Regions:
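C-terminal scaffold of the Radical SAM
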Residues: 1-171
Length: 171
């Protein structure tokens, strides 16, 4: 991952060569394990207005299946750091439908992100990409993918939970 100074340099180069609206949303996506508090301050000072963090889940066993290196707490800390740095928009991405994720795991993940200073939450159904360790484990029968009813339940839970807290579905 490029350090903030290089990202800001790229943004400056783009602005020098192309018209960029003053109110343009400039987004950086990041994984929680790859950022520190000063990272967000540097990006905000350089003109980035939105940070999207790949939180995925508050369940350690789900993060392990997804081969994620951050702890649930680290993901929540990263959202707080971005907000404290004054980043205008902070978003967390969740993934549902991971093998071994229960409905209670999913509800706890939603509860966790609802208590953070974010203004957007994305909830995506897991897509297992060929060539990944997860795809191999599923193909070998080591992990079972959830059925369509489980996925539908998790979608509905997220939709109702997030809407009740002012997050609006737009996709």
């Amino acid at each position: 991952m490029l350090p903030p100074g290089e990202l800001v340099g790229l943004l400056d180069a783009i602005r020098e060569r192309f018209p960029v609206a003053d109110d343009a949303e400039i987004t950086k996506e990041a994984n929680p394990e790859s950022v520190e508090p000063d990272y967000f301050q540097a990006l905000r000072d350089g003109g980035f207005t939105r940070i999207s963090l790949g939180y995925q889940s508050s369940a350690p066993h789900v993060l392990e299946v997804l081969d994620r290196r951050h702890s649930p707490g680290r993901g929540l800390d990263a959202a707080r750091w971005a907000s404290e740095a004054g980043v205008e928009h902070v978003s967390l991405d969740l993934i549902y439908g991971t093998p071994g994720e229960s409905l209670d795991d999913w509800r706890r993940s939603l509860d966790a992100v609802a208590d953070t200073p974010v203004d957007h939450v994305s909830a995506y159904s897991l897509i297992v990409e060929e060539g990944t360790r997860l795809a191999l484990r599923v193909r070998k029968g080591e992990l079972a993918m959830p059925d369509e009813d489980d996925l539908a339940d998790k979608y509905m839970i997220a939709d109702e939970f997030l809407a009740a807290r002012g997050f609006h579905n737009y996709e």
